[in-house]
Amino acid sequence: MLDAFSRVVVNSDAKAAYVGGSDLQALKSFIADGNKRLDSVNAIVSNASCMVSDAVSGMICENPGLISPGGNCYTNRRMAACLRDGEIILRYVSYALLAGDASVLEDRCLNGLKETYIALGVPTNSSIRAVSIMKAQAVAFITNTATERKMSFAAGDCTSLASEVASYFDRVGAAIS
């Protein structure tokens, strides 16, 4: 995993050059937006349990067969596994947002996820739906448009961070499909 700083150093080192120019400007921007980034991660992790349970509930409401005998969320053990997977995905999305880099998400969460779900018979369309619900929730929290819970954020526009987190959820959806 490379955070924004490590990535700049590795790129400059590969060119045998000092850190400067656009790389240095990108780091300045990353630091300037640091409080907004931390607030965005905090909004996700502070609401993680509710986000995951709401996403799984929404997925089940749209596909009640999941909790019928033989469904993938039938029995407490399977439901717990579904909730656990949602928590893991959300945790790695928050890591990626904190680092400003998707490599931790790709390497430690998405690598082999589709194959695992296929082997376990997990319906991918339902999983993708749960991920899309979490994506909408995360964007709402980051842009402070969640109707039930407002967060205090550092001054400034957070739409770029909302777009960034949305792209991480899109990667999860693409990895599962």
UniProtKB/Swiss-Prot annotation:
Entry membrane topology: Peripheral membrane protein
Alphabetized Pfam families for the sequence: Phycobilisome
Database matches in SUPFAM superfamilies: Globin-like
The record's account of how the chain is modified after translation: Contains two covalently linked phycoerythrobilin chromophores and one covalently linked phycourobilin chromophore.
Binding site for (2R,3E)-phycoerythrobilin 1: 82
Keywords: Antenna complex, Bile pigment, Chloroplast, Chromophore, Electron transport, Membrane, Methylation, Photosynthesis, Phycobilisome, Plastid, Thylakoid, Transport
Listed GO biological process terms: photosynthesis
Gene3D superfamilies, per the entry: Phycocyanins
Recorded superkingdom: Eukaryota
One Gene Ontology cellular component annotation held by this UniProt entry: phycobilisome
Residue positions binding (2R,3E)-phycoerythrobilin 2: 158
Binding site for phycourobilin: 50, 61
Complexes and interactors: Heteromer of 6 alpha, 6 beta and one gamma chain.
Function: Light-harvesting photosynthetic bile pigment-protein from the phycobiliprotein complex.
Protein name: B-phycoerythrin beta chain
Protein's gene: cpeB
